[in-house]
């Protein structure tokens, strides 16, 4: 009985060992397959990680390149802006200089024009003054001549009146001797005296008209001078 039991145990042990070996072989095979798959996965993962690092490096490089390009563009824009700003300042300075030169030119031109106008006004004043003095002298001489002629006329009228009275007295004495005389000596002397007075009156009237005409011309000349001075704004400022 013991022998049978031992034989049975050996048989069971032999069967279990084969199965165990077989199972181990299967497990080892699966482990090898699994290890191979894991290696493949590790390789793929490493490859993926490598690609990821390359992509990240490339992205970083691209970003750095873009940043550098943007920075260069920004620096270039700043430089262009500075150049435009400096050019604008230069243009403004140039325009200011031109405006100052033109302003100085206008100022010189205005000063010259003012001086020329002053010279013309002064020359016109001197001419008008000379003309007025000349006319006033003529008027004074004519007035003196008129007064002289009036005195002469008065003296001559008195003289003629005295002569007429004397002649009239003599004629009256003679007419007493010749009562039939048709022509009255009194009327003859009276007509002569009247004619002489008319001639003197005409001369005096001519002189008075001449004086009046000269006075009118003198007044017109003075008015023209006043208007000329009044119309000149620069002359007004000078007088003020």
Swiss-Prot record:
Instruction: Name residues in a coiled coil.
Output: 55-223
Q: Which InterPro entries match?
A: CCDC152
Is Coiled coil among this UniProt entry's keywords? yes
Keywords for this protein:
Coiled coil
Please state what the protein is called: Coiled-coil domain-containing protein 152
Species of origin: Bos taurus
Provide the organism lineage as a comma list: Eukaryota, Metazoa, Chordata, Craniata, Vertebrata
Give me the gene this protein comes from. CCDC152
């Amino acid at each position: 009985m013991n022998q049978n039991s031992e034989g049975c145990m050996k048989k069971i042990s032999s069967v279990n060992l084969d199965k165990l070996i077989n199972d181990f072989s299967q497990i080892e095979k699966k482990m090898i397959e699994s290890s191979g798959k894991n290696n493949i996965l590790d390789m793929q993962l490493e490859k993926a990680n490598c690609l990821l690092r390359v992509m990240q490096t490339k992205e970083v490089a691209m970003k750095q390149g873009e940043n550098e390009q943007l920075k260069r563009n920004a620096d270039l824009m700043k430089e262009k802006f500075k150049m435009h700003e400096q050019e604008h300042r230069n243009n403004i300075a140039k325009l200011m200089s031109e405006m100052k030169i033109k302003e100085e030119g206008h100022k010189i031109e205005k000063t010259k024009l003012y001086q020329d106008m002053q010279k013309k006004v002064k020359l016109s004043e001197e001419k008008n003054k000379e003309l007025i003095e000349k006319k006033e002298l003529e008027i004074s001489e004519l007035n003196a001549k008129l007064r002289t002629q009036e005195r002469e006329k008065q003296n001559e009228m008195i003289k003629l009146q005295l002569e007429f009275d004397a002649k009239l007295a003599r004629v009256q004495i003679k007419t007493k001797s010749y009562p039939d005389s048709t022509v009255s000596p009194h009327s003859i002397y009276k007509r002569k005296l009247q004619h002489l007075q008319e001639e003197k009156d005409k001369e005096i009237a001519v002189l008075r008209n001449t004086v009046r005409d000269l006075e009118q011309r003198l007044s017109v000349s003075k008015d023209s001078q006043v208007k000329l001075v009044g119309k000149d704004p620069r002359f007004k400022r000078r007088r003020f």
